[in-house]
Design a protein with these regions (language model features):
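The conserved cystathionine-beta-synthase
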Residues: 18-35, 82-100, 107
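A positional/architectural concept
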Residues: 2-48
């Protein structure tokens, strides 16, 4: 796997979303139901923000409360960083590290086509390393057998 497109082909393109008016309680339930760390906030087909477990943790610590009936738009991150399916896994790692983020929506020609997480990136890197190791082991074994 070399690109975001490869990751999406492996994991699928399912994106869980909420609307800006969805309550924080419903947002938390959606995160739990789908066992995901972030949801995109979408309105009229446009990404308006992203809300993550980290957003909840920071806001609760900041306010010392979680008003569960508030709309998610009051807590979401509004400046969403998105990537193209053609971006490399290495570029994603650098971007996530530099911006201190764990989730990246994937947009192709203005259309939302998926979302990737730091966990997806780690799995892709490990898979690539395992393939490299297996290839090297096979090469070494073949060299021993030929000598």
């Amino acid at each position: 796997m070399n690109t975001v497109k490869d990751i999406l082909a492996e994991k699928g393109k399912q994106v869980w979303t909420v609307t800006p008016k969805t309550t924080l309680l419903e947002t938390l339930k959606t995160l739990r139901t789908h066992n995901v760390g972030a949801l995109l906030v979408v309105e009229s087909g446009m990404v308006r923000g992203i809300i993550s477990e980290r957003d909840f943790a920071y806001r609760i610590a900041e306010k010392m409360a979680c008003p569960l009936d508030e709309p998610v738009e009051t807590w979401m991150t509004k400046e969403v960083i998105a990537v193209s399916p053609t971006i490399s896994i290495n570029e994603c790692m650098q971007l996530m590290s530099r911006e201190h983020i764990r989730h990246l929506p994937v947009v192709d020609e203005g259309n939302l086509v998926g979302i990737i997480s730091i966990g997806d990136i780690v799995r892709a890197v490990i898979s690539g390393q395992q393939s490299t190791i297996l290839g090297l082991e096979n090469y070494i074994l073949s060299q021993r057998l030929n000598n």
